Design a protein with these regions (language model features):
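Short, well-ordered alpha-helix to beta-strand connector turns
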Residues: 50-51
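Peripheral docking tails and interdomain loops at the edges
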Residues: 56-116
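An N-terminal assembly and electron-transfer interface module characteristic of large anaerobic redox
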Residues: 34-37, 42, 91, 114-116
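Redox- and metal-dependent alpha/beta enzyme cores, enriched for Fe-S-associated oxidoreductases
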Residues: 1-30, 36-42, 105
Length: 116
């Protein structure tokens, strides 16, 4: 599975990949640093070789996925979103990836984890 990120998600995605490997799940990371100019051809080349893609975003609306799709036409296989104002922790991503690989949906952090 390829985890796609942008902005502040870089480090937590890398930590998550290490934990996924410990759980027997092979994952890699494609991270976008520059939005303008967006290198759509290079992005398509990389994304088209991925077996399964999940985008990790710290927002409600899936802002980067919409931008990626508008620039490349590429639609990711899954989404992990967190929008409670707190950053992702690796277990959020690991649990969501595991759930999506089982066929479930994991769009955001469960409500009970938001209320502290």
């Amino acid at each position: 599975v390829t985890l796609i990120g942008w902005g502040s998600t870089a480090d937590v995605i890398q930590e998550s990949i290490e934990q996924l490997a410990e759980a027997g799940i092979v994952a890699n990371h494609l991270h976008f640093k520059w939005m303008v100019p967006f290198h759509a051809d290079e992005a398509i080349d990389l994304l088209s070789s991925c077996k399964r893609t999940i985008i990790v975003e710290n927002n409600y609306s899936g802002l980067f996925h919409r931008y990626l799709r508008s620039e490349t036409g590429f639609t990711v296989d899954g989404h992990i979103r967190k929008y409670d104002g707190e950053p992702f922790k690796p277990h959020h991503i690991v649990n969501a990836v595991q759930e999506q690989l089982k066929g479930g949906e994991a769009l955001s952090v469960p409500y009970e984890e938001i209320i502290v």
